[in-house]
């Protein structure tokens, strides 16, 4: 692989180079040229990163035959003349930039051993010449080619003026003399008698040197032991005598690569001497000078080369080669076009175009660098001025340093706070530490951040709490309908604080189905108590640091949610709502957040809550914590034990209608600007909406459907207004165009007002136009239940619902079969419910054996029990009595009393045990139209707490044993 660099030499008066070692050369000139050779050898030749060009700093060209260190077998410093015609030369294929005559390039041969051997043999034969050609593909990194089509046909005949042979790498410094054209590849043929060119003349040369009247100075010592410099010179006569015999075998070498090629010299056409040529050359010279202004690195050398005394204007060929070597932004094909061209006029035009492009690129680069440098200098200047200004202000006492400002700010905060002694001690220690830290250090930022958080805690600050019960009751009733238990508990809380004459905290948990107002009631409570409100959700939280903060040694450390809350509300007695506490993430890599809440929600511990970031106890005993949850069974036991549980049940249809009238519809009228005169929703439409569209326990879905009605009505009114405005606009336009038309009357305007004032009434007949088809077409799955089908009552996170139990025979009962019967369950049942099935089967067998001893139904029957809606998981023990009734109904082949529902857990002896969710189940029974409901006797107290309107229209039967229910099962 080649690594190339270039050194610029003058090509004019090249014939003077042949006299470098002659006796008539002065010693001063010889020493000067030796110095130039030393300078050239000391240059660091460029690598793969691109070409670096160096220029001579003296007028005379560097003599390539002055003091060059040759191979040891080359003999003395006998000059070798460059042959005018040498057709067979080794081929060197390079990348990117062509090598033009009069210039130098460094080439390394690394991989190809055959090419290395050929170059070494040529050097030993004192034939240090080669042909350099540019590859067409810049990505081709091979050192040899397999076909001449891979390179451009025109290249340069070069002389190897310096060699560094390092074994694995052969470093060559090439000096180009003329342009050549590659004709065909040839095979390398080693002559039988390899005699050095100067071998036969060595003795004669030494004799001539001895008899010369002027002895030239001795050659200088070699520059480096590994450097071999070759600058052979032979006369034209000797070159003719020693012509190389052309090889007999030609052709492209596909496997080993082309390393030797037959060439011919490229002869340029005569230079036209006219004004156009001179003008073009002068334009080129001037453009080169302009380019040098933007790149001062080689400005002095180029200006010397372009000096009028050098007569560059008389050598257009060299000027074109100079331009091709100077340009750095040109493409390979553009440079090769100049190499191929033999018409000097065209070459000058190509050179002018290239140097003008280079000028544009150089100017753009210069402008960019200048802008960047200006910005850097301006920034540096501003920085220095700011630093000087700070020092001046500090000396004059106008401004204090950053540390003093921070400490004074902290002291101002402390004056308004009642900071405890232990916290004040930590603050003073950190202030002292801050004074000795460098403001630019990371520890300074950590300490300052810690002090800011520590002084942001509202130590001893509390907001005045409302203790007027009437005001609190009014605030709660205005925001929410119903929720009797919640409102009573808050009133009790206010009463206790009133009697204690102090501000206290509490930990409450509102649990119930979604959409019943658990989260919104918390904000109303904060308003009623005149406390600051802060909410954060722990649903899906998996990191303990969200609650207790990070260690402040961590990068980007922050305190937990409670400290952030205290900083925001600026009081020690806010109302903090912890939402979705039943959906908190489990224990993981970052700890267990549920366990972290234990300290926060424990009344005995939160008076000294320790955040990891502050590492100072903070009093949270005055905070009123309110948690919300849908299912309390998912809350960890220790955490549930620390909270006071308050059930927020679902709403009946009547309650939903009242909520819609008192809260939902007024709020939507305010949001949509639709007055009562524009839209009216009848009660029958609301009841239909609740019954067939929104059966959930909450009112969130009901709110969405009512909002949809308002949007449809708003669209209808807006369209009507646009239709009424368009005729009026057209009439106004017509009057403007025709001034003689009759004046417009106010009839259309009155009609528009009348149309816009028409009221939209939503009733049961047009409800589907606004909200679509009903989602629930029937209240119950069975209007008449067959044998084996019983309606039970279930309680889910969405509220109460009817749960049917279906029991059928898989095949007819064969009493003669010796095999026992079986039972199968489907419907996505949980483990507890599957156990209830087995328990119910045992109880049913006992009752059937008692009532009909001869009935062997359960011994031989293959029974299948299914609970509909199999996509919904079902679990729990409350379906025990329903399962027993279903099995007995199937065994006796008798349907139970219609419009009957039941719930309760069954024991193995038939005892009916209490269950939860009585309110939700009673609501579900009313919704599906059940008339008789069986409840466990121990749930009587829960039923008594229900409002009277909820108990009406229901025949409630309380049972303690299943026998009591069995007596009324088939009546």
Curated annotation (Swiss-Prot):
Its main location: mitochondrion. Disruption phenotype: RNAi-mediated knockdown causes transcription factor atfs-1 accumulation in mitochondria. Residues 214-224 have a biased composition (Pro residues). It comes from the Eukaryota. It is an enzyme of class 3 (hydrolase). PROSITE patterns: LON_N, LON_PROTEOLYTIC, LON_SER. Residues 733-749 have a biased composition (Polar residues). It holds the Pfam family Lon_C. InterPro entries: AAA+_ATPase, ATPase_AAA_core, Lon_bac/euk-typ, Lon_lid, Lon_proteolytic, Lon_Prtase, Lon_prtase_N, Lon_prtase_N_sf. PANTHER family: LON PROTEASE, LON PROTEASE HOMOLOG, MITOCHONDRIAL. ATP-dependent serine protease that mediates the selective degradation of misfolded, unassembled or oxidatively damaged polypeptides as well as certain short-lived regulatory proteins in the mitochondrial matrix. May also have a chaperone function in the assembly of inner membrane protein complexes. Participates in the regulation of mitochondrial gene expression and in the maintenance of the integrity of the mitochondrial genome. Binds to mitochondrial DNA in a site-specific manner. Involved in the degradation of transcription factor atfs-1 in the mitochondrion. This is Lon protease homolog, mitochondrial. It comes from Caenorhabditis elegans.
């Amino acid at each position: 692989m080649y690594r190339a660099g270039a050194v610029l030499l003058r090509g004019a008066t090249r014939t003077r180079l042949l006299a470098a070692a002659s006796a008539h050369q002065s010693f001063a000139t010889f020493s000067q040229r030796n110095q130039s050779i030393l300078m050239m050898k000391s240059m660091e030749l460029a690598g793969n990163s691109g070409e670096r060009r160096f220029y001579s700093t003296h007028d005379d060209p560097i003599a390539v035959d002055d003091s060059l260190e040759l191979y040891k077998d080359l003999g003395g410093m006998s000059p070798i003349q460059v042959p005018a015609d040498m057709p067979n030369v080794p081929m060197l294929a390079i990348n990117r930039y062509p090598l033009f005559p009069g210039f130098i390039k460094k080439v390394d041969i690394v991989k190809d051993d055959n090419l290395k051997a050929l170059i070494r043999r040529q050097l030993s034969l004192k034939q240090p010449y080669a042909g350099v050609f540019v590859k067409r593909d810049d990505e081709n990194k091979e050192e040899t080619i397999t076909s001449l089509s891979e390179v451009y046909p025109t290249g340069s005949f070069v002389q190897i003026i310096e060699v560094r042979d390092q074994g694995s790498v052969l470093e060559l410094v090439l000096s180009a003399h003329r342009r050549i054209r590659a004709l065909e590849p040839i095979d390398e043929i080693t002559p039988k008698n390899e005699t050095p060119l100067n071998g036969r003349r060595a003795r004669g040369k030494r004799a001539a040197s001895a008899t010369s009247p002027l002895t030239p100075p001795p050659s200088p010592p070699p520059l480096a032991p590994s450097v071999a410099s070759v600058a052979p010179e032979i006369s034209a006569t000797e070159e003719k005598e020693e012509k190389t015999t052309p090889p007999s075998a030609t052709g492209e070498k596909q496997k080993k690569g082309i390393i030797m090629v037959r060439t011919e010299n490229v002869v340029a056409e005569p230079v036209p001497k006219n004004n156009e040529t001179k003008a073009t050359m002068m334009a080129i010279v001037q453009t080169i000078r302009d380019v040098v202004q933007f790149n001062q690195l080689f400005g002095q050398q180029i200006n010397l080369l372009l000096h009028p005394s050098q007569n560059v204007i008389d050598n257009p060929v060299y000027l074109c080669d100079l331009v091709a070597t100077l340009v750095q932004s040109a493409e390979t094909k553009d440079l090769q076009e100049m190499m191929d061209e033999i018409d000097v006029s065209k070459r000058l035009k190509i050179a002018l175009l290239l140097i003008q492009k280079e000028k544009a690129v150089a100017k753009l680069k210069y402008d960019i660098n200048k802008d960047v440098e200006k910005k850097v200098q301006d920034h540096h200047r501003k920085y220095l001025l700011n630093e000087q200004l700070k020092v001046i202000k500090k000396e004059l006492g106008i401004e204090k340093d950053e540390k003093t400002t921070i400490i004074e700010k902290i002291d101002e905060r402390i004056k308004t706070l009642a900071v405890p002694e232990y916290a004040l001690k930590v603050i003073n220690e950190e202030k002292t530490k801050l004074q000795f830290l460098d403001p630019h250090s990371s520890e300074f930022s950590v300490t300052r951040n810690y002090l800011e958080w520590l002084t942001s805690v509202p130590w001893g600050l509390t907001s005045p709490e409302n203790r007027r019960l009437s005001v609190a009751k009014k605030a709660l009733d205005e925001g929410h309908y119903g929720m009797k238990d919640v409102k009573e508990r808050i009133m009790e809380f206010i009463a206790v604080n009133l009697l204690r004459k102090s501000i206290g905290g509490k930990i409450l948990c509102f649990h119930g189905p979604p959409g019943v107002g658990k989260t919104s009631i918390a904000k109303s409570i904060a308003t009623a108590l005149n406390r600051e409100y802060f909410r954060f959700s722990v649903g899906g939280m998996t990191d303990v640091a969200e609650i207790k903060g990070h260690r402040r040694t961590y990068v980007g450390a922050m305190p937990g949610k409670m400290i952030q809350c205290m900083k925001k509300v600026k009081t020690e007695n806010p109302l903090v709502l912890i939402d979705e506490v039943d959906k908190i993430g489990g224990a993981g890599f970052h700890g267990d957040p549920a366990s972290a809440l234990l300290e926060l929600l424990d009344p005995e511990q939160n008076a000294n809550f320790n955040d990891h970031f502050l590492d100072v106890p903070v009093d949270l005993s005055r905070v009123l914590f309110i948690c919300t949850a849908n299912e309390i069974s998912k809350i960890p036991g220790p955490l549930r034990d620390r909270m006071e549980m308050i059930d927020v049940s679902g709403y009946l249809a009547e309650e939903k209608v009242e909520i819609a009238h008192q809260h939902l519809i007024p709020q939507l009228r305010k949001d949509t600007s639709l007055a009562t005169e524009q839209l009216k929703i009848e009660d029958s439409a609301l009841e239909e909406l609740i019954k067939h569209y929104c059966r959930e326990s909450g009112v969130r879905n009901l709110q969405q459907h009512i909002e949809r009605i308002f949007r449809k009505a708003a669209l209808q009114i807006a369209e009507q207004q646009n239709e009424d405005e368009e005729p009026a606009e057209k009439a106004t336009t017509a009057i403007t165009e025709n001034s003689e038309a009759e004046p417009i009357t106010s009839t259309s305007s009155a009609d528009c007002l009348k149309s816009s004032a028409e009221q939209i009434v939503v009733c049961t007949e047009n409800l589907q136009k606004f909200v679509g088809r009903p989602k629930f077409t029937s209240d119950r799955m069975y209007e008449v239940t067959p044998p084996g089908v019983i309606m039970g009552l279930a309680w889910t996170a969405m509220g109460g619902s009817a749960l049917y139990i279906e029991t059928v025979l898989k095949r007819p009962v064969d009493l003669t079969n010796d095999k026992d019967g079986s039972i199968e369950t489907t419907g996505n049942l949980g483990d507890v419910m599957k156990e209830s099935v087995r328990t119910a089967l045992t109880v049913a067998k006992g009752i059937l054996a008692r009532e009909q001893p001869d009935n062997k139904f359960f011994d031989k029957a293959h029974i299948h029990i299914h609970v509909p809606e199999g996509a919904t998981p079902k679990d729990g023990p409350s379906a025990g009595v329903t399962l027993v009734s279903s099995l007995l109904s199937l065994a006796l082949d008798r349907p139970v009393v219609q419009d009957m529902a039941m719930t309760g857990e069954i024991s193995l002896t038939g005892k009916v045990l209490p269950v939860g969710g009585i309110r939700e189940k009673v609501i579900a029974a009313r919704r599906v139209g059940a008339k008789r409901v069986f409840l466990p006797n121990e749930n009587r107290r829960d039923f008594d707490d229900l409002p009277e309107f909820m108990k009406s229209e229901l025949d409630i039967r309380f049972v303690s044993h299943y026998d009591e229910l069995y007596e009324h099962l088939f009546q």
